[in-house]
Swiss-Prot record:
Protein name: Small ribosomal subunit protein bS16
Record flagged with keyword Ribosomal protein: yes
Gene3D superfamilies given in the database record: 3.30.1320.10
PROSITE patterns, per database record: RIBOSOMAL_S16
Annotated GO MF terms: structural constituent of ribosome
Record InterPro entries: Ribosomal_bS16, Ribosomal_bS16_CS, Ribosomal_bS16_dom_sf
Gene name for this UniProt entry: rpsP
One Gene Ontology cellular component: cytoplasm
Short name of one Pfam family: Ribosomal_S16
Amino acid sequence: MVTIRLARGGAKKRPFYNIVVADSRNARDGRFIERVGFFNPVARGQEEALRLDLDRVDHWVANGAATTDRVAKLIKDARKAAA
């Protein structure tokens, strides 16, 4: 099953997440099909905290990709900010 989920990066105690489309059988930070954005939970000041390619997210969801709970919330926030 294809899922849209967070893949952790960054340093210890400084998380940074790539939002990726991946097969659910692959490891969290392993192989993925496409990177559709990023999420920086510790962004400060003018740093960009969230970027999502909503066209690609819509494409994958239309083709049956499931989203995790956290990614669904991030998509909702991105749509709200874009409107």
